[in-house]
Every structure is written in C-alpha cells, then in structure tokens.
Regions:
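Gram-negative bacterial Sec-dependent N-terminal signal peptides
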Residues: 2-19
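A residue-level marker of the well-folded mature domains of exported/periplasmic proteins
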Residues: 19-259
Length: 259
C-alpha cells in the first residue's frame, strides 16, 4: 500500500463524522519502529497539514504497538482512543480477528473506523484501503516459477497467523504455482515472525532441513532491498543464496530482511 494515501483515509473518516471546531483523528499502525510505518506516519502528518490548510482543522494522534505481533497492545490503543471519543480512527489491524471487537465497540460508541493495509473480518468499518495482495503474491509466485524454469523445489516462508495482508499474498503465491506441475512445494507451514531474529531462525531451520531450494519469502524488506517495484506497488528482490538456491523477497511492509 502507498503510505501517501493517508489523505484519502482521513477524508473517508471525515465524511463519516459531524464537523466540529477541530477533528481528532487517531492513526494506529501495526507497528511503529520500521521504515514502512515511519513513511505512513509522514503521510498522515502531510494529510493533517493539508486538511488544516484547506479549512478543516485536524489534530493527528499517532500510536501503535512496538512489535507487530503485540495484539494486546494494539487492542488497548484502540480502546483508549475510543474512550477519548476521538472523531475517527484509521487502523491497520495486525490481526484480522483479534481487532474485530475493539472496532465494533468504537463504532458503537460513535467513532467511525477506516481500515488500511490489512483487512478485518468485519463489516463495521467505513472503508478498507490497500493494495491487491492476492495479485501481488500471484505475480511473485509466477515470477519465481519462471526464474526456476518451471522445475524444482519451493519453500514458502509465511509471515504470521492472523495477518490478512500477508495471508492474501501467500494465497496468491500458492495459486500461481498451480500452473507449474513440475514444481514441488516442500514447505508452506512455517512462519518468519515480526522480527529479523525470528525470520533468520526460521529460514535457517528450513535450510538445514531441506538444503538447496527456491524460496518465496513474502513478508520481509528494508530500505536497502528496493530493487524492483511492480504495478501493485510492492517491492521485490532476487538473490542467490549461499547454498545455491534462488531467493525471492516479496514484502508486505517495511520489516528488516533477515538476509
């Protein structure tokens, strides 16, 4: 997702509230430490300034969990902003199910919610804004298969359970592989997790177990790995592993690559 779309998200929230002297918009990311979320923050601040300059005074609140697997902290942030009766919430839920009740409670309390980046299993939100993650994953799977000549062994290293954006991308990746019967998927049930350390350990375990393979590593990237950007706005990176295997890094958001 393009982080500069925060202006659109703010507009969607504003269209659902009764105008007051100053509108208070809470933007709640999945995490706050990585480059992607810092760029999202910059986009939110830009939207705040532009709306205020255009005659709609907006005060932005930015708060989220430090780690992108801390469901409890993100739930608490949503509940706290609901209790403060902000004008609206813009939320990137790190779990598609765990944030359903907090969002429902916010809407019931009169606080409209826009979901971005990763979907929520709910119909309570005003709108949902994101890239086509299934299509992005499909592009990655098709490209990896072609780079391997349509033959070989494949490992899919997933991100984490409950992350709707990466789950859609993983589904697209696997769907693309169906067109290549000579490719063998030997692992698709392991998770990288939210940090460099957990991703590195997961990948090392798979390397030790399976040896030379082709990889689809869907969740990881950092600002140094931006080599190819496709139509879906997703960065990808190819490289040759030390074991001779071909790797594809095809991220969802700005998390450090473990390689």
């Amino acid at each position: 997702m393009n982080p500069r779309r925060l202006g659109l998200l703010a507009s969607l929230v504003l269209s659902s509230v009764v105008y007051a002297k100053e509108l208070t918009i809470a933007v709640i990311p999945k995490g706050t430490t990585h480059e992607f979320w810092k760029s999202v923050h910059a986009g939110a601040v830009k939207a705040e300034r532009e709306l205020t300059a255009a005659g709609t005074p907006v005060k932005l609140f930015w708060k989220g969990p430090l780690r992108e697997d801390d469901r409890d902290q993100q739930i608490q942030v949503v509940e706290n902003f609901t209790a403060r009766n902000v004008s609206g919430i813009v939320l990137a839920p790190l779990d598609s199910q765990a944030l359903v009740n907090p969002v429902r409670s916010a809407v019931k309390a009169g606080v409209p919610v826009v979901i971005f980046d990763s979907d929520l299993k709910s119909d309570q939100q005003v709108s949902f804004v994101a890239t086509d993650n299934f299509k992005g994953g499909h592009i990655a799977g098709d490209y990896l298969a072609k780079r391997l000549g349509g033959k070989g062994r494949i490992i899919l290293l997933r991100y984490q359970v409950g992350s709707a954006s990466t789950e859609a991308r993983e589904a697209g990746f696997l769907d693309a592989l169906k067109a290549y019967p000579d490719l063998k998927l030997i692992s698709a049930d392991q998770y990288a997790g939210p940090t460099r350390e957990t991703a590195y350990q997961a990948s090392q375990n798979l390397l030790n177990r399976h040896g030379q393979v082709g990889w689809g590593v869907l969740p990881q990237r950092d600002r140094h790995d931006r080599h190819d950007q496709g139509a879906e706005g997703n960065w990808s990176r190819w490289w040759q592993g030390g074991d001779g295997g071909l790797r594809l890094g095809f991220p969802v958001c700005g998390r450090p690559s473990p390689w």
